[in-house]
Amino acid sequence: MESVLRSGGTTAEDVVLNLVSMDYNELLMAPSGHASEKALDDMNAEDHILVVNGSIPTGENGAYCTIGGKSAEQVLLEAAEKATAILAVGACAVWGSVQAAKPNPTGAKGVDEIIKDKPVINVSGCPPIGEVITATLTYVLTYGKTPEVDAEGRPKFAYDQRIHDSCPRRAHYDAGQFVKTFDDEGARNGWCLYEVGCKGPSTFSPCPIVQWNLKSGWPIGAGHPCIGCT
């Protein structure tokens, strides 16, 4: 949500107030308690687009996360039943992320590990790019169908190129100019970060093109190697 709030183009408030009907969101909705649960039940009774962020803890019969007396998994399954499109937003919702790392005591899972009877659009990233989230929603609303996805379930219109292909440091890679340590001359001169762990050559994402915070920055632009979060 923070990523969307700080995205460019159409503002988050314009999307929420003028373009879509956001019927249930724990962070933005005004109702609480029984009123919020009624809003969720009302939404589940009609066709809707479901956007999920965060992994789903399934261990101990769902005891690690309950909402209105229901496990997070049960809430997800009920919300997905009449959903015309399902978006898993962020690395946690897509793959379970850090919470799903061994030994994974909470049994955290990504959305498509639980929803098996419908396609799930994976908008990956930590955080995901706000413009990609709104672009995916706009595609579904405009065309009445889900966008074409890659082998990982990500929209091809956003995840069809490697970070390496559009990286402003690519010329240094081609010239064999690599940062060896974060305080060396290469680091100060903006050389390629591949030899200090950059995953840009194998990571598909529009990060170098869209960036974050009104296009004011992104990890490699700040001197940190890509960690491959998408």
Residue ranges of each PLM-predicted region?
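Iron-sulfur-associated redox domains of electron-transfer enzymes in respiratory
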Residues: 1-197, 201-206, 219
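Extended hydrophobic packing segments that form well-structured cores
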Residues: 212-230
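Short Cys/His-rich Zn2+-coordinating modules
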Residues: 206-212
